[in-house]
């Protein structure tokens, strides 16, 4: 028995790690190599990965996209429809 919840409409690729108490809601896609910590909430229609790391106790609202290689530390809140890319512009503060 899983110690996390994934709605039946979501897709979880092979080679992913999902922490205890995490909930993944409708129409999400979690790509290969992604690690999601404990007690996270992933809202509807979220795309994560590949090779993304999400810390513990994170809340990711509906329609968020998190692209390859992004790392979110513990206790991060992502508002609706935000997009995290893997492009870091010179002289940018992240």
Show where each model-derived region lies.
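Flexible, glycine/small-residue-enriched loop-and-beta-strand segment within the central core
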Residues: 2-8, 14-16, 23-94
